[in-house]
Amino acid sequence: MVSRAGLASLLGASFLLLLARSAEPLGFSHRPRTAGGELSAAPSRYLAREERWMSQRLDHFSSSDHRQFKQRYFEFLDYHDDPTGPVFLRICGESSCDGIPNDYLAVIAKKFGAAVVTPEHRYYGKSSPFDSLTTDNLRFLSSKQALFDLAVFRQYYQEKLNSRYNRSAGFDNPWFVFGVSYSGALSAWFRLKFPHLTCGSLASSGVVLAVYNFTDFDKQVGDSAGPECKAALQEITRLVDKQLLSDSHSVKALFGADSLKNDGDFLFLLADAAATTFQYGNPDALCSPLANAKKKGESLVETYAHFVKDYYIKKLGTTVSSYDQEYLKETTPDDSSSRLWWFQVCSEVAYFQVAPKNDSVRSAQIDTRYNLDLCKNVYGEGVYPDVFMTNLYYGGTSIAASKIVFTNGSQDPWRHASKQKSSEGMPSYIIKCSNCGHGTDLRGCPQLPFRIEGDSSNCTSPEAVNTVRKQIVKHIDLWLSQCHEPARAW
């Protein structure tokens, strides 16, 4: 999911999915090849980066609007030795899609001899239908339109394969879809809405539940931090809230964020910075300095300010401006991911990371009113997240589908918007370790910075990760084999 900083910071510097600003080893050892098929001297973080294009319909729900836009996608065929072998559709989410990541999906693809294809999400990166991102132009940005994009792309690429191998138009490779976070939700929803187009789905940290007041997010941040670190964060919040009343400019300048005039925007930045460490498996980066400062009697606020500037902003590439509502109002920003994702938040899924009434880590000023005011200020009247209708359409955590694997890291605040309990045909796994966060099954530990092939050796419990990975492969193997049966059991 995206953090305020925008998912571009994350997939670009990895993948920042915090809310509103806001896919491992099985014993396979190999040296990944480049997209051109040559063995590389050192593993790359991408399997493929060569851009390919297709024409996509702007509005799939209109019979009279025939406008189209160019959608970018990538393909990796090095492991696809059997033309009848599976195709893995890896879904890109709420950020620019600059290639196919060389994470644990690469290991799975090699095992199954799969082709890997990745289309970029409409509006993000280079797949935008419009030069100007006005609210009116954003009305075609939704998960529903994105799912039809995936269906059209799937059919387009299948026809492309059939033509390449001189096959009849009716031939169908077995397809399997993958996604992490919001794209994990899209993966599950694609299997729900288009079961005839895929043999199964992996929804890694798939946030399938639209949530209006997402208080469980902050509660999980506190739980993941542990008593000592949580208490330090709460003390920092109390002191910063107090300093904002007496000298807001000075305290914002301390964090390098004096450009943020809205106190809520500033407080959201501070909350995101803390949450990111647990979401992406780096708890010690935050909690160790705070514990040392507490022990030495040093300023917790100054220590946290150093962390925000050195880790969240400098190391992860977060920009302070992405938290500024005035920046979010820009219709032609240099990095549009934040404005785009916030529109999806404000119009469809909410995920409002508000402070719980009691024992909150984040400031109480980050409440429902703050989020609603942001939506109105940035996009105007009439943009409102109808989470009831979203959950009615997809089913939320009661999704009535089959052959979907749900996975979540135990420390990830986003897991409370995912399906955490298994049901018939939809196994769910919680990967338990102290640095198992967002997309651990595909990304390894920590989840940021990027780990080649989703290396799990730095997880506090590699076995916990690898056990779930074995289960994922087991389900993929079974469901792909059922796709090959004459009756093609869905």
Predicted regions and their residues:
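Catalytic-loop region of hydrolases
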Residues: 2-115, 140, 474, 478-490
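Conserved alpha/beta-hydrolase
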Residues: 111-128
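Glycine-rich "HGGG/HGxG" loop immediately N-terminal to the catalytic nucleophile
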Residues: 123-137, 152-155, 212, 441-442
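Alpha/beta-hydrolase active-site loop
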Residues: 138-165
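Alpha/beta-hydrolase fold nucleophile elbow
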Residues: 163-181
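Glycine-rich nucleophile elbow surrounding the catalytic serine of serine-hydrolase chemistry
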Residues: 179-189, 414
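A catalytic-pocket lid/entrance helix-loop region that shapes and gates access to the active site
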Residues: 196-299, 303
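C-terminal subdomain of alpha/beta-hydrolase-fold enzymes, centered on the catalytic histidine
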Residues: 265-490
